[in-house]
Amino acid sequence: MRLSQLLKSKLHHARITYCNPDYVGSIEIGQDLMDAVGLQDGELVHIWSVTGTSRIQTYAFAGPRGTIGINGGAAHFFESGEKVIIAAFDLSDEPILPKIVLLGEENQIVKDMTPFSVIG
């Protein structure tokens, strides 16, 4: 059996609503968004800036609708209003159909991009 690391969840064009360097760490994501793409509290996520060059990994936890908050040291790498991609991966020996959503200016879902497509 050979395991591959495959995309399972993606929040495309999320907007950071706050940065708090004094928090212990992690990213706070609206519960509605976590549910939409199958993310769990404590799950490892990758955060890639669309408007800058930062790329980090941290763990996610659920927050209020519309929230995308960067906490801890990672807050020094991002700014409120910055556009990011949040992704999570899973190990599998079978294909995974990733859950992908495109977000609008207020972190609302504007398009369900599942099934996976390279066409925006």
Locate predicted features.
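Extreme N-terminal tail/first-helix region
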Residues: 1-7
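Helix-rich terminal scaffold detector
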Residues: 3, 62, 94, 99-120
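Compact, glycine-rich, soluble single-domain proteins
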Residues: 6, 16-17, 21-94, 106
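Eukaryotic proteins' extreme N-terminal regulatory segments
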Residues: 12-13
